[in-house]
Amino acid sequence: MAEERRRDDGGDVEVELSLRLRTGDDSTSADPAPATVAAEARRNLTIFYNGRMCAVNVTELQARTIISMASQGNFGKQQQQQIQGRDDHHYHQGESSSGGGVSTAAARHCDVAGSSSSHSGSGSGSATPPRPALVSPRAGLQAAAAAAPTMNQPPAASGLSMKRSLQRFLEKRKTRAAAPLYARR
């Protein structure tokens, strides 16, 4: 995905998003196995949003839809289709029906859709699992970005881990130096 920034006459910055896909080797070899084709149909998409990074596994159609919505800026107006009749395995694998909601893959990947489920108010204690509520694509992307590990940690947390790492390194170095293999003569 490429991002270009242009200035309008009014000084506003427009962001143009585009998706450039390469198919790889264009040689006329034998047809690939169906499993290979299915695996290549889904690719990782890295989303940088609100200072965070989230990598999700999406199809080309879903990636194009995300880019289209990002360039139009109408995240709040569109809603994804409600997911019904899927078992938990498919729910976490990122499977979606033909052209299903874009944010469903991101939400399932980051385990956020389960937290936005709605319970039926029957009160009878039925054993049916709660169904996920409708989530807008923007909410799905925000939740995916929130659940993703951040690359830029706060200075205090990264400073402590760096200090601990350095202490472990120095202790191991001292142990290696004292070992008979490295004994000084």
UniProtKB/Swiss-Prot annotation:
Compartment annotation: Nucleus
InterPro entries: CCT_CS, TIFY/JAZ, Tify_dom
GO CC terms in record: nucleus
Low complexity bias: start-end ranges: 137-157
Motif Jas in this chain: 155-182
Location of region: Disordered: 77-185
Stretches assigned to the Tify domain: 38-72
UniProt entry tagged with the keyword Nucleus: yes
Span(s) of short sequence motif Nuclear localization signal: 162-169
Induction statement: By abscisic acid (ABA), and drought and salt stresses. Down-regulated by jasmonate and wounding.
PTM comment: Ubiquitinated. Targeted for degradation by the SCF(COI1) E3 ubiquitin ligase-proteasome pathway during jasmonate signaling.
Keyword rRNA-binding annotated: no
Main location group: nucleus
Biological process, per Gene Ontology: regulation of defense response; regulation of jasmonic acid mediated signaling pathway; response to wounding
Membrane-spanning residues: none
Keyword terms: Jasmonic acid signaling pathway, Nucleus, Transcription, Transcription regulation, Ubl conjugation
Similarity comment: Belongs to the TIFY/JAZ family.
Domain commentary: The jas domain (155-182) is required for interaction with COI1.
Role played: Repressor of jasmonate responses.
Entry protein name: Protein TIFY 5
Organism field: Oryza sativa subsp. japonica (Rice)
